[in-house]
């Protein structure tokens, strides 16, 4: 079985993935999809295949760059689709953050099961946007799980 991990934008989206990857590496084939950000540097030490997608960061304040985000997201999703078609995983595990968005949307379009995990009490923007594309939204807190029709509290993956 092959698992594609995704998540990034900050170390908080990557370090829990590394803990899970370490635990699962002897039983599953592991790969990672993310941007050229911190996730790429942190995952490099793990030694698994890394698939790079150029995903724009969501900007919440008004800036002219916001007008380019939809087109850049489409391009990032297409890139993720091409990668997943060539090397389809059996499932995708997302830890959230803007870097995970293309992998989750592409996996959903290809009918690849997706799990996402939200560590924070208040769900992040990416989790809110992809929740309906996932089989489950796994959470660290019971009250967070209640915010999603497919929410399930499982605790937090740590090293």
Residue locations for each model-derived region?
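An aromatic- and histidine-rich active-site surface loop
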Residues: 37-41, 91-110
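Structural motif
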Residues: 6, 33, 94-95, 117-118
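An amphipathic, basic-hydrophobic alpha-helix
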Residues: 62-91, 109
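Active-site-proximal region of nucleotide-activated glycan assembly enzymes
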Residues: 2, 108-159
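Short amphipathic alpha-helix
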Residues: 13-24
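Residue-level detector of alpha-helix initiation sites
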Residues: 10-11, 15, 97-99, 121-125
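Conserved nucleotide-sugar phosphate-binding/catalytic loop shared by glycosyltransferases and other
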Residues: 2-8, 27-72, 152-154
């Amino acid at each position: 079985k092959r698992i594609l991990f995704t998540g990034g934008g900050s170390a908080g989206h990557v370090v829990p993935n590394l803990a899970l990857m370490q635990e699962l590496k002897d039983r599953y084939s592991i790969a990672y999809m993310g941007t050229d950000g911190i996730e790429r540097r942190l995952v490099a030490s793990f030694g698994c295949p890394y698939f790079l997608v150029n995903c724009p960061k969501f900007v919440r304040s008004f800036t002219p760059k916001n007008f380019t985000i939809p087109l850049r997201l489409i391009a990032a999703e297409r890139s993720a689709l091409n990668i997943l078609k060539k090397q389809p995983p059996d499932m995708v595990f997302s830890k959230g953050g803007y870097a995970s968005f293309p992998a989750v949307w592409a996996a959903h379009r290809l009918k690849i099961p997706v799990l996402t995990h939200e560590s924070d009490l208040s769900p992040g923007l990416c989790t809110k946007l992809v929740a309906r594309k996932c089989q489950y939204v796994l959470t660290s807190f019971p009250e967070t799980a209640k915010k999603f029709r497919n929410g399930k509290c499982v605790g937090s993956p740590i090293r």
